[in-house]
Amino acid sequence: MPQIEELRRQRAGINEQIQALATIEATNGTLTAEQLTEFAGLQQQFTDISAKMDRMEATERAAALVAKPVKATQHGPAVIVKAEPKQYTGAGMTRMVMSIAAAQGNLQDAAKFASDELNDQSVSMAISTAAGSGGVLIPQNIHSEVIELLRDRTIVRKLGARSIPLPNGNMSLPRLAGGATASYTGENQDAKVSEARFDDVKLTAKTMIAMVPISNALIGRAGFNVEQLVLQDILTAISVREDKAFMRDDGTGDTPIGMKARATQWNRLLPWAADAAVNLDTIDTYLDSIILMSMDGNSNMISSGWGMSNRTYMKLFGLRDGNGNKVYPEMAQGMLKGYPIQRTSAIPANLGEGGKESEIYFADFNDVVIGEDGNMKVDFSKEASYIDTDGKLVSAFSRNQSLIRVVTEHDIGFRHPEGLVLGTGVLF
């Protein structure tokens, strides 16, 4: 095509020269012998160039008729760009677990899975640098996200217990055991001297192991919905055990000493009268007595709240007066007598000789501290067994499952005993 354009420009130039000679002839009437020779030469050049252009154009038309379309496969390879993974609280923990499971515990492959399949470079880097004995050590920032999520699931955390670091697994917190006193005195008389007495709240890390079975059909798959399934299973396993530990464990078997054991130790129990009728008046009076016991203990009551069984909660929620009005309508907003209320299955409703009793916990959770060691480890197994909800030993291999083991360490302590009240023998 460029050659044809050049020939057209040449032919146009020759035509201008021919037209100039023709103008001379038209004006003067005759051309000289030299001009006639030039005219004949230019005319021949014009004819030759035109013929050459005709041949070149014919060649291009013929080539176009027999040309084949370019196939799509002749293009360069497509560039596939994976979408950025969705970020949410707990995403790091979930993707670490999924990567370790997909790689069957091989940390090098797990880091590659996080990078290539999940497209999360930060998780890949965390796996590469967090190897430790007994599993993969979860980085502190990811561990903090898990604690934040547990706050909405564990009622002790939800009601305001404060989480503090537990360096090296131990900590002693000073607490006021006996307050200083004040007195009046007359002129020229000595004031009575008194001082506050302190002792320590000692926290020692207790190891909790959560076994989380995951279907092998989910392993190796990426996606937000799969991640949510894995995350919820992990949080449920941890939160259910934490509720029981923080409220009802007694320190045996390397467990924390929970609220019930401390309330018993400090004589902060308020039993329901066994012969009392269960009705609106007796229930309301009993709840007032629990609050009053906390007040009379000079509790600061900065962040007081209720914890109770599901049965007790529903009894109070559905309690109505003689006009059919709900007695405690504020429970719809999560409050009871002006204080936050939470329920949990970790508080039984089948206690006592007849299996009909339950418990009500009332505490100033501002004085409840949960010491977090900060070390959380994750490990994987395809052959291990676990105990299901019925207490039966289950083989993960026989159920086409894999087990994720999450190891964390913590303890619970209470800075002021007077802020804790435990209602026992509750029949509603």
Swiss-Prot record:
InterPro entries: Phage_capsid, Phage_capsid-like_C. Residues 4-24 form a coiled coil. GO terms for cellular component: virion component. Gene3D superfamilies: hypothetical protein PF0899 domain, Major capsid protein gp5. It comes from the Viruses. Keywords: Coiled coil, Late protein, Viral capsid assembly, Viral release from host cell, Virion. NCBIfam families: major_cap_HK97. Belongs to the HK97 phage major capsid protein family. This is Major capsid protein. It comes from Klebsiella oxytoca phage phiKO2.
